[in-house]
């Protein structure tokens, strides 16, 4: 069944079509390049062998009367991170490591957690079954203590084995939503047709299992906040701008939402834009989609989309549109610290227009939420701001 054309006339998308042509040319130039040290989807036998080797090392340590320990790349230091403009933030090949020792009061529990989770992952892969992070937590909630401890152990194991989480047969529940001109088949054969209606589709739990993706979308819009996403659907923005796809991670995106956006980019190579608040935390979220995060830098190749463009809300838009000053919010001390941190990151050097916008925010000492546009008119965002941005190439 073909998607029903409901959007604007073809000439509306001229700027988008030109942008896509430049993206396709760039993709063609960089085809086949994979960064050294990138995680890859490993076969079940490879992961099982890697786990067996780790356990053998522990047994050998015990046999030599040495203290068993896990050696894990340090994912919490900028010294271990490099910027690659084709991938984003990724770990350097020879990064510093940390030891999780079994005889240290500070790390003995962490050692036990990793050992326990390794055992569970081994059984999952052997039986070709999957479990969610939540399932793993509830198998021994007393040992784990909290969900965050499980999440951290899984990420450490993924980093230690140099494989993405999906190769470990561990899934996470999705909080993200998707709407628009897209249909696909899930791993179990379920056919899903996303729509432009007010009811969005939940991001699948197993992104790797998505098959037969079909779309005629001209662009993909990532919306920072669920409230803005729902407002756009209620205002029929998705229908009026059809064909398009909209995604929200409801704030800081979970892994599945990031994997989905990456899969859509890799499959269709359509322009991807972000709509975030003009504040340091909105910009941080946009940077996670575009360049990745320090903690997940070992898996950047599977998660980042450096071609993402910032559609709004730009600090310069606040001045250009004469948004009332009483709707602006002063930057807090934490905001200013976050802004300073972003300005010092390696990728900002490669984005002079972004840097200019961030400096404008720093100079004004003010921030604005997307909702501030409603002061101009209740549907200004969906009927004026976004359509004009898309039509006239108002992205950076």
Swiss-Prot record:
**Reported tissue expression:** High levels are found only in the testis where expression is restricted primarily to meiotic germ cells. Not expressed in spermatogonia. Highest levels are found in pachytene spermatocytes. Very low levels are found in thymus, brain and oocytes of embryonic ovary. Not detected in adult ovary. Isoform 1: Expressed early in meiosis, when most double-strand breaks (DSB) are formed.
Localization of this protein: Nucleus
Q: Mind listing the UniProt keywords for this protein, alphabetically?
A: DNA-binding, Isomerase, Magnesium, Meiosis, Metal-binding, Nucleus, Topoisomerase
Q: Does the keyword DNA-binding apply?
A: yes
Reactions performed catalytically: ATP-dependent breakage, passage and rejoining of double-stranded DNA
Q: An example Gene Ontology cellular component term from the record?
A: chromosome, telomeric region
Gene encoding this chain?
Spo11
Q: What is its EC number?
A: 5.6.2.2
Q: Identify the residues that the record assigns to the Topo IIA-type catalytic domain, covering every copy.
A: 42-177
Coiled-coil residues: none
**What residues sit in the active site?**
138
SUPFAM superfamilies recorded: DNA topoisomerase IV, alpha subunit
Q: What class of enzyme is it?
A: isomerase
The principal location of this protein is nucleus
The GO terms describing molecular function are:
ATP binding; DNA binding; DNA topoisomerase type II (double strand cut, ATP-hydrolyzing) activity; metal ion binding
The protein's required cofactor(s) are namely: Mg(2+)
Q: Name one GO biological process term.
A: synaptonemal complex assembly
Residue positions annotated to bind Mg(2+) are 224, 277
User: Which family, according to the similarity comment?
Assistant: Belongs to the TOP6A family.
Q: What is this protein called?
A: Meiotic recombination protein SPO11
Upper lineage is: Eukaryota, Metazoa, Chordata, Craniata, Vertebrata
């Amino acid at each position: 069944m073909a998607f029903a054309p409901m959007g604007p006339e073809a000439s509306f998308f001229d700027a988008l079509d030109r942008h896509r042509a430049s993206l396709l040319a760039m993709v063609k130039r960089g085809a086949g390049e994979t960064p050294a040290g990138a995680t890859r989807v490993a076969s079940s036998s490879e992961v099982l062998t890697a786990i067996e080797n780790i356990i053998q090392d522990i047994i050998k340590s015990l046999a030599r009367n040495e203290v068993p320990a896990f050696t894990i790349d340090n994912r919490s230091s900028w010294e271990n991170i490099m910027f690659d403009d084709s991938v984003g933030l990724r770990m350097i090949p020879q990064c510093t490591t940390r030891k999780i020792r079994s005889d240290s009061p500070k790390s003995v529990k962490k050692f036990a957690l990793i050992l326990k989770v390794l055992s569970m992952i081994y059984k999952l892969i052997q039986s070709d079954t999957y479990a969610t992070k939540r399932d793993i937590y509830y198998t021994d909630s007393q040992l784990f203590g909290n969900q965050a401890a499980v999440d951290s152990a899984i990420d450490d194991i993924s980093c230690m084995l140099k494989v993405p989480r999906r190769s470990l047969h561990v899934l996470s529940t999705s909080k993200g939503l998707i709407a628009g001109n897209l249909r696909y088949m899930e791993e179990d054969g379920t056919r899903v047709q996303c729509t432009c209606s007010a009811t969005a589709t939940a991001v699948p739990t197993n992104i790797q299992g998505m098959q037969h993706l079909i779309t005629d979308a001209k662009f993909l819009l990532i919306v920072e906040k669920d409230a803005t996403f729902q407002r756009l659907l209620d205002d029929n923005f998705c229908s009026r701008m059809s064909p398009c796809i909209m995604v929200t991670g409801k704030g800081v995106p979970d892994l599945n939402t990031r994997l989905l956006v990456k899969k859509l980019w890799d499959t269709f190579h359509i322009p991807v834009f972000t709509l975030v608040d003009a504040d340091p935390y909105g910009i941080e979220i946009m940077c996670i989609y575009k360049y990745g995060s320090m903690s997940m830098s070992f898996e950047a190749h599977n998660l980042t989309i450096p071609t993402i463009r910032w559609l709004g809300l730009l600090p310069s838009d606040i001045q250009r549109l004469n948004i009332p000053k009483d709707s602006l919010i002063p930057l807090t001390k934490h905001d200013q610290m976050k802004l300073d941190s972003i300005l010092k990151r390696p990728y900002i050097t490669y984005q002079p227009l972004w840097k200019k916008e961030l400096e404008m925010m720093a100079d004004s000492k003010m921030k604005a939420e997307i909702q501030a546009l409603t002061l101009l008119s209740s549907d200004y965002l969906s009927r004026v701001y976004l359509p004009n941005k898309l039509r006239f190439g108002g992205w950076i």
